[in-house]
Each structure stands twice: as structure tokens, then as C-alpha cells.
């Protein structure tokens, strides 16, 4: 009954023709000690619940932006469950292939599953077409997959970042099937603080070290103001020859660095 209460669909009991038994549950022998009505164990048909019964607790800060030397991707590493810190070492940048990265914001299971599935589909595309999938095609593929489950409780807000024949690419995709191309995005509970830093310091003409520092500072500022973000700042750089992991800096060390520079 726990599953039925979540899905809010009645369990099929002794329906005519169910499992081809013509409503005769006595023909289904589950052995000694089994419930009298074995058909009550069957899962209900798929349906959309009227209202979610499981509260999704999440918080994070991720960002990505394009500049003249590629795409910068950064994220914190804290995982929370309501007021509790579940982990300080979560990897929120998912490596799809050597030229594509995805970020994780929302439900960790949803993001991890769908982006791993995307990685599989991208590999199949490469084997069939003998060429690397474009960033636009990869993001569209993900948007199409999750759109089929719109309204069913998925929680995912991701950025697909990469480099293809057209140059650096950056797309935002969420669990509602939305897909947006842009030059800079930040997703998560701390994104408002990260955007404040990015809006002030972002320029397409940034040098590499300037871009690194901007991303670190934006994530640090979000962790300083948002209780659901923290841990370490994981920084990646997507270049023409593929992505590299630049650094992983503890936010406590960044706090000492940035506060000591204030007069």
C-alpha cells in the first residue's frame, strides 16, 4: 500500500482478465504463508500523482560562462538534505565525454542518471556517424529525453558545456524540457549571489587566469551567503582540445585569500 499511496492509484485486485486469470486469484499460487490475495502484490499501472508525496530537499551553486578561450565551469561540492549537510565532497560537474561537461543542480539522482544516459547516447552517436556530437545536439537530446517525463516529479537544472566545430557552446536544460543557449548561466540556491559577482566582472575578452579567478570568486561568494552551498570550488576549463580540471579549492582557504585582500 506504500507504493499505491505515493502514486495515488488503486491496486488492481481481482479485475476481470487481470494477468489472464479471469479474476480467479486462486489460480495464482504464491506458496505457503503468502497473502490470501496474491494479485494485491502487483504494481499499479503508471500514472502521474496528483501531488508529490516526497519532498525534494536540495541546494547548490553551479555556474558556467563562455569567453574568448573556451568555457569555464565551476561548482561547489556540498550536498544537503534539508538542514543537514550530507556530504562536502560531491562531484557536481559530470564528465560526459572528453569535450562535453554537464553540471548537477536539483536532485542528485535525477541529474546523475540523465547525464549518464546522455553520455551513452553521445557515444552511440559517435559510433554511428564517425564524428563527435555537437554541443547543440547533445543538449537537444537531453531536453527531448526529460521532456517525456514532464510533470512527473523530476528535479534537474543542468548546463551542457563543450567545444565542437562551431567553437565553444553553452546550453541550459531543465527537467521541464526547457533548453536555452547563452553566454553565462548560474543554477542553484546560491545562483543569485554568483550572478552578482559574474555581472560585475564578466567580459568575453577575459584572460584565462582572470576567468579562473572570476569563477572561484563567484562560487565562493555564493557559499558565503548560501547555507546550502559549500565544501570546495571545483573548476573546469573547456578548450578546443578538450576539457581540463583546473583546481579544487576549499572555500575556507578562499575566504582567507579574499578577506585578507580587503583593506
Swiss-Prot record:
Keywords: Cytoplasm, Hydrolase, Nucleus, Protease, Proteasome, Threonine protease, Zymogen. The keyword Cytoplasm applies. The active site is at 60 (nucleophile). Transmembrane segments: none annotated. GO terms for biological process: proteasome-mediated ubiquitin-dependent protein catabolic process; proteolysis; response to oxidative stress. SUPFAM superfamilies: N-terminal nucleophile aminohydrolases (Ntn hydrolases). The 26S proteasome consists of a 20S proteasome core and two 19S regulatory subunits. The 20S proteasome core is a barrel-shaped complex made of 28 subunits that are arranged in four stacked rings. The two outer rings are each formed by seven alpha subunits, and the two inner rings are formed by seven beta subunits. The proteolytic activity is exerted by three beta-subunits PSMB5, PSMB6 and PSMB7. Directly interacts with POMP. Interacts with ABCB1 and TAP1. This is Proteasome subunit beta type-5. It comes from Rattus norvegicus.
Amino acid at each position: 500500500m506504500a507504493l499505491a499511496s505515493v502514486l495515488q492509484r488503486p491496486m488492481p485486485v481481482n479485475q476481470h482478465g487481470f494477468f489472464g486469470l479471469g479474476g480467479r486469484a486462486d489460480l495464482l499460487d504464491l506458496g505457503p504463508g503468502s497473502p490470501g490475495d496474491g494479485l494485491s502484490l502487483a504494481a499499479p499501472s503508471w500514472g502521474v500523482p496528483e501531488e508529490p508525496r516526497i519532498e525534494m530537499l536540495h541546494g547548490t551553486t553551479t555556474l558556467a560562462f563562455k569567453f574568448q578561450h573556451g568555457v569555464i565551469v565551476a561548482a561547489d561540492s556540498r550536498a544537503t538534505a534539508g538542514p543537514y549537510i550530507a556530504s562536502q565532497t560531491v562531484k557536481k560537474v559530470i564528465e560526459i565525454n572528453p569535450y562535453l561537461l554537464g553540471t548537477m543542480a536539483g536532485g542528485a539522482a535525477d541529474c546523475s542518471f540523465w547525464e549518464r544516459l546522455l553520455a551513452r547516447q553521445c557515444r552511440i552517436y559517435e559510433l554511428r556517424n564517425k564524428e563527435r556530437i555537437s554541443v547543440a545536439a547533445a543538449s537537444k537530446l537531453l531536453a527531448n529525453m526529460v521532456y517525456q517525463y514532464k510533470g512527473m516529479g523530476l528535479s534537474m537544472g543542468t548546463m551542457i558545456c563543450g567545444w565542437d566545430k562551431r567553437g565553444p557552446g553553452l546550453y541550459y536544460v531543465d527537467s521541464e524540457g526547457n533548453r536555452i543557449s547563452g553566454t553565462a548561466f548560474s543554477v542553484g540556491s546560491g545562483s543569485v549571489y554568483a550572478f552578482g559577482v559574474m555581472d560585475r566582472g564578466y567580459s568575453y575578452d577575459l584572460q584565462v587566469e582572470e576567468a579562473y579567478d572570476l569563477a572561484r570568486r563567484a562560487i565562493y561568494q555564493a557559499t558565503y551567503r548560501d547555507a546550502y552551498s559549500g565544501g570546495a570550488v571545483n573548476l573546469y576549463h573547456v578548450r578546443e582540445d578538450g576539457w581540463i580540471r583546473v583546481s579544487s579549492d576549499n572555500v575556507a582557504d578562499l575566504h582567507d585569500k579574499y578577506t585578507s585582500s580587503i583593506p
